[in-house]
């Protein structure tokens, strides 16, 4: 699903003495099937963008085109409800939304509310557990008996069961251990490769560099820069100005370069860093 913002502005508590401008004349494009990350400091407007895309908030000015749906200040609730069937929104600490006695009951809650027969909903639940790499035996477990990473995957499965075209991720791996983080991000990468459009808000620059096709940098409610990971993270003076951290692999490669190690710093992640270091050692070995 392609998404286009055109001159979008939004204020919280509009027309009150407490009105706060969250977005100011923002325009950008998110290509269909892309993995786009939105970064910036607290208060820059990142989460507001996600809520506008989902129709939880309505633009004060401008419009948003999401697939065949357009959202503007005149959009109504019925129109937005139809659109939201195409969108999956995974919030921070999404496992806190689990409330049923068993994993199966949690998973089928949404489909049943949309009129899906219970038998069909249960079959969907079995299939979606496989997508998030959990065994079918988990269906009868209580979410309270699962680890934090497993609960997060169940929460993600409860969104994926409706097969949304668009996934909105708000700090999706916050609070997880490194192993669980990798599993969750690899899951999103596979879903993206299968054609789902993904928009992620994150402070995890390693994940932003590793998985994104495009990065949108927000600053105080305005677009600061839009570019590929290579374009964003190669400009150190810009990163310092925006107070954005270099991904750890890129930072390590640049530190090696500074002390004379002949390494290509145009890398995205730790896997590429290790390959590049190994390559340079092999080159040095062949010279001897």
From Swiss-Prot:
It is found in: Cell membrane. GO terms for cellular component: ATP-binding cassette (ABC) transporter complex. The keyword Kinase does not apply. It comes from the Bacteria. The keyword Nucleotide-binding applies. It holds the Pfam family ABC_tran. It is a peripheral membrane protein. Residues 3-245 form the ABC transporter domain. CDD domains: ABC_cobalt_CbiO_domain1. ATP binds at residues 40-47. It is an enzyme of class 7 (translocase). GO terms for molecular function: ATP binding; ATP hydrolysis activity; ATPase-coupled transmembrane transporter activity. Its EC number is 7.-.-.-. Keywords: ATP-binding, Cell membrane, Membrane, Nucleotide-binding, Translocase, Transport. InterPro entries: AAA+_ATPase, ABC_transporter-like_ATP-bd, ABC_transporter-like_CS, ABC_transpr_CbiO/EcfA_su, ECF_ABC_transporter_ATP-bd, EcfA2, P-loop_NTPase. Coiled coil: none annotated. PROSITE patterns: ABC_TRANSPORTER_1, ABC_TRANSPORTER_2, CBIO. ATP-binding (A) component of a common energy-coupling factor (ECF) ABC-transporter complex. Unlike classic ABC transporters this ECF transporter provides the energy necessary to transport a number of different substrates. Belongs to the ABC transporter superfamily. Energy-coupling factor EcfA family. This is Energy-coupling factor transporter ATP-binding protein EcfA3. It comes from Oenococcus oeni (strain ATCC BAA-331 / PSU-1).
